Swiss-Prot record:
It comes from Rattus norvegicus (Rat). InterPro entries: Ig-like_dom (IPR007110), Ig-like_dom_sf (IPR036179), Ig-like_fold (IPR013783), Ig_sub (IPR003599), Ig_V-set (IPR013106), Na_channel_b1/b3 (IPR027098). Regulatory subunit of multiple voltage-gated sodium (Nav) channels directly mediating the depolarization of excitable membranes. Navs, also called VGSCs (voltage-gated sodium channels) or VDSCs (voltage-dependent sodium channels), operate by switching between closed and open conformations depending on the voltage difference across the membrane. In the open conformation they allow Na(+) ions to selectively pass through the pore, along their electrochemical gradient. Residues 179-215 are cytoplasmic. This is Sodium channel regulatory subunit beta-3. Intramolecular disulfide bonds favor the voltage-gated sodium channel oligomeric complex assembly. SUPFAM superfamilies: Immunoglobulin. A voltage-gated sodium (Nav) channel consists of an ion-conducting pore-forming alpha subunit functional on its own that is regulated by one or more beta subunits. Forms homodimers and homotrimers. SCN3B is non-covalently associated with alpha subunits and induces the formation of alpha subunit oligomers, including trimers. Interacts with SCN5A/Nav1.5; regulatory subunit of SCN5A/Nav1.5. Interacts with SCN7A/Nav2.1; probable regulatory subunit of SCN7A/Nav2.1. Interacts with SCN10A; regulatory subunit of SCN10A/Nav1.8. Residues 25-138 form the Ig-like C2-type domain. GO terms for biological process: atrial cardiac muscle cell action potential; cardiac conduction; cardiac muscle cell action potential involved in contraction; cardiac muscle contraction; membrane depolarization; membrane depolarization during action potential; membrane depolarization during cardiac muscle cell action potential; nervous system development. Residues 1-24 form the signal peptide. It is found in: Cell membrane.
């Protein structure tokens, strides 16, 4: 039985790894919306297919709208990568997956003028025997570019919660130590009182307190 308990966690890890390799899971994770000037910025666009075994013709279009402006095409994927003429020319890099569920792009050397609204359009035409349905999904990414990296609010909250938890655990441990100390002290005092009471009994009473054994 102990050997089985040791092998069970290992078998679970192997099973999880096998499932992840054999049955990859697509998760539509939203993109980050803040970038730092001069750094690369990945614009994440994920459009999962409910039935991955079905073949589909996929077309991806990336649009950019500056503040107070109109949308214009900056990148297109149609039977291959195609970067169109735009202010982003030479600074866009394809960062998608082979199955075209992840169709993200990366903006290199981000500038302050790159702030604005990015639109990711994914058009799919599925190939069935009877019909060819068409599905289109859209992802909007409002990007804000700053000169310097600001402190992440999520990390600040996580750090504060970590310190609060640490203080709580310290207080709890301190209270448990006091409780255990008092419990042990009371047990020792009770033992000493019993010993003192026994010693205070006269020797005659001790002899009389012995119960005779019937023959």
């Amino acid at each position: 039985m102990p050997a089985f308990n040791r092998l069970l966690p290992l078998a679970s890890l192997v099973l999880i790894y096998w499932v992840r390799v054999c049955f990859p899971v697509c998760v539509e994770v939203p993109s980050e919306t803040e970038a730092v000037q001069g750094n690369p910025m990945k614009l994440r666009c994920i459009s999962c297919m409910k039935r991955e075994e079905v073949e589909a013709t996929t077309v991806v279009e990336w649009f950019y709208r500056p503040e107070g402006g109109k949308d214009f095409l900056i990148y297109e994927y149609r039977n291959g990568h195609q970067e169109v003429e735009s202010p982003f020319q030479g600074r866009l890099q394809w960062n998608g997956s082979k199955d075209l569920q992840d169709v993200s792009i990366t903006v290199l050397n981000v500038t302050l003028n790159d702030s604005g609204l990015y639109t990711c359009n994914v058009s799919r035409e599925f190939e069935f025997e009877a019909h060819r349905p068409f599905v289109k999904t859209t992802r909007l990414i409002p990007l804000r570019v700053t000169e310097e990296a600001g402190e992440d609010f999520t990390s600040v909250v996580s750090e504060i919660m970590m310190y609060i938890l640490l203080v709580f655990l310290t207080l709890w441990l301190f209270i448990e130590m006091i409780y255990c100390y008092r419990k042990v002290s009371k047990a020792e005092e009770a033992a000493q009182e019993n010993a003192s009471d026994y010693l205070a009994i006269p020797s005659e009473n001790k002899e009389n307190s012995v119960v005779p054994v019937e023959e």
